[in-house]
């Protein structure tokens, strides 16, 4: 995997930086593990825009990912590493000894032909999935469940990972990339190592059209709008916000806490905000 800076043969390619991985599989995805993905363009069931800046983009098929890693005690060979348009990480196609195939998030350092396993008895090596109670304290992990059996929810993006800090009784403490320290049950599963494609954050899009291919529409600044459209709008000539920065609906935009889930507040040992 390498970063390639393109030659400025056009205005759009000037400054563009791509992530090139010659080891990625160049064929079609495994048909049995793909599903139709309908583009919603940011609209809800009544056709109204509920998420701005979405629409258009290339048609995509969804790859069904095994986030539970619950096929225990059966060795699986990494058949190939593939690109997935639905996420920043690459995915790996596993072929189990009984013939079943499943996609997983491709961990860093895992190569084609390597043997992986899941379950409490799996060895401690990158790509293997185990309950947190069986993982040594201090290990770097990813694809972590928040509830046993629910499937991985934490650290799934390219280059991300979590550190296992401690185990106390039925719960373990994890340090997330944001700095937050969170408790999860020791029966929750996690995968050893960190997510691959770590250079994803270093790419440079280069031109607006590349974002349109991804289904991302333009973002207009509030200060460039009229007062009827945004709280920052209006004024003669170029102006600032003239107030605390807010969203189009008046919610403070920078640093304002929006978490409202009291039910799981006791699972957060230390907030990512130090204040």
UniProtKB/Swiss-Prot annotation:
InterPro entries: NA-bd_OB-fold, Rib_uL2_dom2, Ribosomal_uL2, Ribosomal_uL2_bac/org-type, Ribosomal_uL2_C, Ribosomal_uL2_CS, Ribosomal_uL2_dom3, Ribosomal_uL2_RNA-bd_dom. GO terms for molecular function: rRNA binding; structural constituent of ribosome; transferase activity. One of the primary rRNA binding proteins. Required for association of the 30S and 50S subunits to form the 70S ribosome, for tRNA binding and peptide bond formation. It has been suggested to have peptidyltransferase activity; this is somewhat controversial. Makes several contacts with the 16S rRNA in the 70S ribosome. SUPFAM superfamilies: Nucleic acid-binding proteins, Translation proteins SH3-like domain. Residues 24-54, 223-275 are annotated as: Disordered. Residues 25-38, 229-241 have a biased composition (Basic and acidic residues). Part of the 50S ribosomal subunit. Forms a bridge to the 30S subunit in the 70S ribosome. Transmembrane segments: none annotated. Keywords: Ribonucleoprotein, Ribosomal protein, RNA-binding, rRNA-binding. GO terms for cellular component: large ribosomal subunit. This is Large ribosomal subunit protein uL2. It comes from Azoarcus sp. (strain BH72). Belongs to the universal ribosomal protein uL2 family. GO terms for biological process: cytoplasmic translation. Pfam families: Ribosomal_L2, Ribosomal_L2_C.
């Amino acid at each position: 995997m390498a970063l390639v800076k393109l030659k400025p043969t056009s205005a759009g390619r000037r400054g563009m930086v791509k992530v090139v991985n010659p080891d990625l599989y160049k064929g079609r995805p495994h048909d049995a593990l793909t599903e139709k993905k309908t583009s919603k363009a940011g609209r809800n069931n009544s056709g109204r825009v509920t998420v701005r800046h979405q629409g258009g983009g290339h048609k995509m098929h969804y790859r069904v990912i095994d986030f539970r890693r619950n096929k225990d005690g059966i060795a699986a060979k990494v058949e190939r590493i593939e690109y997935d348009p639905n996420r920043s990480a690459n995915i790996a196609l596993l072929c189990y000894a009984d013939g079943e195939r499943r996609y997983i998030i491709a961990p860093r350092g895992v190569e084609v032909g390597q043997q992986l396993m899941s379950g409490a008895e799996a060895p401690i090596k990158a790509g293997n999935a185990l309950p947190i109670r069986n993982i040594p304290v201090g290990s770097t992990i990813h694809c972590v469940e928040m509830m046993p059996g629910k499937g991985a929810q934490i650290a799934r993006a390219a280059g991300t990972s979590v550190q296992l800090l401690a185990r106390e009784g039925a719960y373990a403490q994890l340090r997330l990339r944001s700095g937050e320290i969170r408790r999860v049950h020791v029966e929750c599963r996690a995968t050893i190592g960190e997510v691959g494609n770590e250079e994803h954050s270093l790419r440079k899009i280069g031109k607006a059209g590349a974002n349109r291919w991804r289904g991302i529409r333009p973002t207009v600044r509030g200060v460039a709008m009229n007062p009827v459209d945004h709280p920052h709008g209006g004024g003669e000539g170029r102006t600032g916000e003239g107030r605390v920065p807010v969203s189009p609906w008046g919610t403070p935009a920078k640093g304002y806490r929006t978490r409202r889930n009291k039910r799981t507040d006791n699972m957060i040992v230390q907030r990512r905000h130090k204040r």
